[in-house]
Amino acid sequence: MSESRTSADGGMETSYGFREVPGGEKQGLVNQVFHKVAKRYDIMNDVMSMGMHRAWKDAMIAALNPRKEPGYKVLDVAGGTGDIAFRIVEASGRQAHATVLDINGSMLGVGAERAEKKKLSGNLTFVEANAEELPFEAASFDAYTIAFGIRNVPRIDKALSEAYRVLKRGGRLLVLEFSEVDMPLLDKIYDAWSFNAIPQFGKAITGDAEPYQYLVESIRKFPNQENFAAMIRQAGFSRVTYTNYTGGIAALHSGWKL
């Protein structure tokens, strides 16, 4: 489970994959990972999910069911390349406005380029900022989405509290994340794929296995479905549920600010 701890010298430590690092160092280490993979992020997700992330994301947007009306505002966090935001805007009939927030400028650069090619720039705003300290007024958004990003945040509880703060009353939180496989045979297959194949595929694609090794380890350190649902409730959300995808390889968590 990814959480902050107090070290022997009184400082806060958190997990970076299977390593324990000072809390203040994790974000910089994660940034290095995503600077390396930004240009090939979709390929990375294909490798990590065995190609299933596209269907999971489509299911996430179907669950959100964005309103087809002007003024509907969504904050997509850790969404630099725009993959989720583009889907939201299209699903709303190009009525919604999505703010794409990411701490990594390289990822945002890829997203902005793609938005121009898709002629969606008018529906999108790209913001470089930290999920733990959102630069928005309270009650600014109708929905908050984050896909495969929350496990990379050093202080997950802080990010969830910020999500609650910036949502309007009646707003919805949706978190799509790799999770704990709940099928006995599938868990062994996915473990073998994750620790043996994924880093090697990553090295073949990008020339560097290390970012993929971290990403695999970060999945194993992330809270399981029930524990993460409890964290969402602790942040103040109501009607908290989750839906497993592909035997729990990923899970979609939902909560409401009521």
From Swiss-Prot:
Residues at which S-adenosyl-L-methionine binds: T81, D102, N130, A131
Biological processes per GO annotation: aerobic respiration; menaquinone biosynthetic process; methylation
Superkingdom field: Bacteria
Record's keyword terms, sorted: Menaquinone biosynthesis, Methyltransferase, S-adenosyl-L-methionine, Transferase, Ubiquinone biosynthesis
Reactions mediated catalytically: a 2-demethylmenaquinol + S-adenosyl-L-methionine = a menaquinol + S-adenosyl-L-homocysteine + H(+); a 2-methoxy-6-(all-trans-polyprenyl)benzene-1,4-diol + S-adenosyl-L-methionine = a 5-methoxy-2-methyl-3-(all-trans-polyprenyl)benzene-1,4-diol + S-adenosyl-L-homocysteine + H(+)
CDD domains, per the entry: AdoMet_MTases (cd02440)
Magnesium is among the record's keywords: no
Pathway involvement of the protein, from the record: Quinol/quinone metabolism; menaquinone biosynthesis; menaquinol from 1,4-dihydroxy-2-naphthoate: step 2/2; Cofactor biosynthesis; ubiquinone biosynthesis
InterPro entries, alphabetized: SAM-dependent_MTases_sf, UbiE/COQ5_MeTrFase, UbiE/COQ5_MeTrFase_CS
GO molecular function list: 2-methoxy-6-polyprenyl-1,4-benzoquinol methyltransferase activity; demethylmenaquinone methyltransferase activity
UniProt keyword annotation of Lipoprotein present: no
Enzyme nomenclature, EC number: 2.1.1.163, 2.1.1.201
The protein's enzyme class: transferase
Region spans: Disordered: 1-20
Family in the record: Belongs to the class I-like SAM-binding methyltransferase superfamily. MenG/UbiE family.
Stated role: Methyltransferase required for the conversion of demethylmenaquinol (DMKH2) to menaquinol (MKH2) and the conversion of 2-polyprenyl-6-methoxy-1,4-benzoquinol (DDMQH2) to 2-polyprenyl-3-methyl-6-methoxy-1,4-benzoquinol (DMQH2).
Protein name: Ubiquinone/menaquinone biosynthesis C-methyltransferase UbiE
Organism listed in the record: Rhizobium etli (strain ATCC 51251 / DSM 11541 / JCM 21823 / NBRC 15573 / CFN 42)
